[in-house]
């Protein structure tokens, strides 16, 4: 449940060349800021078991919305009520410690999501198999490719069986075969009445996976409803923009 949620950020007007220069300017009161509004009065009610796609151009507020639901970002105004365990896949590799091994990161992420160390160790082989990284589990995350990190993040987050799963473009780096595996796992989520949000620039993916879609533009909800209808409106808007810019 989100009621009138607004998120504002303060961003410096000028780019400084170093942390030292920034600190000096700040102490001297010479840093001026602009206010960036990422979300503007967003209200949503999502029932358990809903599969919600979130679409919109870059900078529309999609990732900020996910961060608010994940309690990573606190709203400047409004109310947020989230019931149940949330597993966020907000950015590729977010939350992973680069110097720790894949195994250590799985245990760490699992405990942060409410599982015990023993439970995560017991599930380790299954997680590594799903992520297709069995031979690399004890290597540092910094040695992983982007795709390997994304697969491990998805496998870990979905294995802990959260009530709410947030996916922000985390599948965009996977090959079609792995994406199909992810779809199958998300279908299992649906059958068990779990809720998930899918942020994607692939409108066809949203249409195939979700039964509700939200279109964000400049931090506001432009449309909320049937995925095919919402995506059709968004496509038409995007085409008009291309015609104007061309």
Write out the residue ranges for each language-model feature:
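The feature captures the beta-strand-to-loop junction immediately N-terminal to the Walker
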Residues: 55-57
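H-loop/switch region of ABC-family ATPase nucleotide-binding domains
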Residues: 200-201
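Conserved ABC ATPase "signature" C-loop
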Residues: 218-219, 234
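Pre-NBD coupling/linker segments of ABC/ABC-like ATPases
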Residues: 1-40, 227-246
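Conserved catalytic segment of ABC-fold P-loop ATPases
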Residues: 208-215
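Conserved ABC ATPase "signature" region
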Residues: 20-28, 107, 119-136, 155
